[in-house]
């Protein structure tokens, strides 16, 4: 077993970052995104699947050119290679748990 406190994870940009390869060689990487309204990553893709669980707030996602709205309780499953971006909207922060099905974080910004 490997135990990690959120406060001990690096906070990069808008996310606490749990990179599996650096945390007991876990087979996944997990990011807790805290985005202010208007924030979010531009178009990018990963060579593995990603699952995003929205915990708080609202956002707008674009996946392969299609736009979707999401809010607390919604889940997005983004397949390997799909071009995607998202942005927090509304008056409150967007908080989501992003699970990358890889022990290493790999992202191609487009």
Model-inferred region functions:
Residues 33, 63, 75-77, 97, ...:
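Anionic, Ser/Thr-rich low-complexity intrinsically disordered regions
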Residues 58-60, 67, 83, 93:
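Structural motif
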Residues 80-106:
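Ligand-binding loop in jelly-roll beta-barrel domains
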Residues 20-22, 40-46, 87-89, 108-109:
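Short histidine-centered beta-strand/loop micro-motifs
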Residues 1-28, 109-110:
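A short, N-terminal "cap"/entry segment at the start of jelly-roll beta-barrel domains
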Residues 15, 30-46:
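Conserved short histidine dyad/triad with adjacent acidic residue
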Residues 66-81:
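Short acidic-glycine-tyrosine-enriched beta hairpin
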Residues 34-35, 46-61:
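Short, conserved beta-strand element in jelly-roll/cupin
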């Amino acid at each position: 077993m490997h135990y990690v406190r959120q406060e001990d994870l690096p906070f990069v940009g808008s996310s606490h970052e749990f990179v599996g390869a650096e945390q007991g060689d876990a087979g996944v990487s997990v990011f807790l995104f805290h985005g202010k309204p208007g924030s979010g990553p531009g178009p990018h893709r990963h060579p593995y699947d990603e699952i995003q669980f929205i915990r708080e707030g609202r956002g707008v996602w674009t996946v392969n050119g299609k736009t979707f709205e999401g809010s607390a309780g919604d889940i997005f499953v983004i397949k390997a290679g799909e071009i995607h971006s998202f942005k927090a909207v509304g008056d409150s922060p967007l908080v989501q748990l992003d699970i990358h099905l890889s022990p290493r974080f790999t992202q191609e910004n487009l």
